[in-house]
Amino acid sequence: MKLLEPITINGLSVPNRVAVPAMVTRLSGEDGFINQNVIDRYVRYAEGHVGLIVVEAMAVHHSKSGPLLRISDDSFVPGLTNLARRIHDTSNSKVVPQIIHFLKVARSGWRQTVDMLSLEDIDRIVEEFGDAVARARQAGFDGAELHSAHAYTLASFLSRTNTRQDEYGGKTLEGRLRLIGRVIQNARAKAGKDFPVGVRFDADEFIKDGYTVNDAKVIALRLAQIGVDYLSLSVGGKFEDAVHLQGQVPYPYTGYSGDRAMPGDWYPPVTHAHFSAEIKAYVKANGYETPVATAGKLSNPDDAERLVASGQVDIVAIARGLLADPDWPKKIRNGERDRVIQCDYCNVCKHLDGTHNRVICSLWPQGSLQAPADDPAAKAPQWGSNGANLTATAGKGKITLKWTKAPGAARYDVCRADPMGQLRLEDAVKVTRWEDSNVLAGTRYRYYVRAYTATGQGSSPSNTVFVELPPPDYMTSTMRAEDSVAN
C-alpha cells in the first residue's frame, strides 16, 4: 500500500503516511508539564506504528488556560525531552509538537481579538514562536508544527475577519500573511533550516465573511514559497459562531464551523479531502512539491489508500480513528484489518474536551484512561448456544434491535444494509440494545451485529434480521388515492 510507504519531509524519513494530528487530551496539569498520563497516550501511538505523531497543542506563553501543555520556557524542556525519547525508544514513529499562541477568553463570553494587540505584542509573539521551535529541537523532537488553524492567534490573523488597519490588517491578503511569514522566518533563524517545520491551517473557515478554499490555495502557495516543509489542512473551529453557555469559557467547536472541524456520524466519510486535493494541485501547478496532509472522517483504510495512491494528498491525518485504535497502522500492515476498532464518530471525545474533562474514547473498556494494549492472541467472543438471537421491532419512527450478550465482548458493532445493498457500520455500543431513528418508512433494512474484544477480535456475525418501518398515515392515504386514480 502506498499509504504505508515512507515519505521524506526536509530530510526526515517518516515511516508511513499515517499521521495522528494534534488532539487535546486534557491529561496535563494546570502547570503544563508533561506527566506519565501524557507519555502513555503518545507512546500508544508509537506502539501502533503511526508514521507521524503530532503532540497536542502546547503554548508559547504562560496565559492561564487550564490543562494545556507548555513550551514557553526552558523549564518545560526536560519533560518534553522525556516524551520524545520514550516515543523514539518505542518505534520508528516520528514526533513533532504542535505549537500554539491563543488570545484571552472569559466566562462572560468576552474574548480578545487581533485588533487589540499592539505592535509590541506582535513582536513578542514572533519571538515566542521562534523560541518554542528552538526548544522543540533541543528536546529531541523531529520537527515542529505551527498551529494556524481554527480559533487561535495565527489563524485569526489569516482570517478575512481580521479587522486590523495596519500592515497586519485583513483588508489585504499580504497583510493577513505577514504574521505567519515573520513567525516562520524567526523559527528558521533560531532552530535552523534543516529542522522540519509544518503549518496546520484551515482550508475553509466555514463562517460568515471567513475565507474559503480560494484563499486557502493562495495561503498554501505562500507557505510553500517561504519553505514550510508540510501543509496540514483542517477546517472551521471558530469562535465567531460558537455557542456560548452561561458561565462557561467559550468553546470554538460548538457552532457549525465546529461541526465541520470534527464532523459527527451524520456527516459523510472523507468530509474534507477534496479541499486538500485542490490545494495540493494548486501548489504543485505553481512548481512546489510541498507534502499535504488531509483530515476529516478518514478511518477507513480504503479511503486513505485511495487518496494517497492517486496523489491527491501525501499524508492522511486520522484523529478520532487513531484515538479509538492506536494500532490501526500496525493492524493494516499485518493484514488484520478486521481487528481494527472502527471509530463510530459519536463525538464523546469532543464533548469531553468541550466540558474540560480528560479526553478518552467511548469504545475503550469502562474506566480506561488509555487505549488497551494490543493482544493479538486474545480469543474472539462467542455467541451462546442459541446464537445472538437478534430481533428487530419497528414502530414510532424507529427500529429497535435487541440481542443476547456474548461472553468476553467489550463492544458490539451494529451494521445495516439498505435496499441498494450498501452495508455500513452504524454504531458501536457496549449494551445489547440499539435504536435506529434514521430510517425511511416503507424501506426494507437488513441488520446484523458482531461482538468484539477490547483489542478487536470479532465474533461471527449474528443472525440477520430484515425489517421495514410501517408507512406514516399521510403516506398510506396518499397511496390509496393513487390506487383509486389508477383503477
Task: Label the model's feature ranges.
Residues 377-408, 441, 454-487:
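Pro/Thr/Ser/Gly-rich low-complexity, intrinsically disordered linker/stalk tracts
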Residues 102-104, 204, 408, 419, ...:
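Short coil/turn motifs at secondary-structure junctions
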Residues 1-380, 385:
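Flavin-dependent oxidoreductase catalytic cores
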Residues 413-442, 454-461:
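Recognizes extended acidic, P/S/T-rich segments that occur
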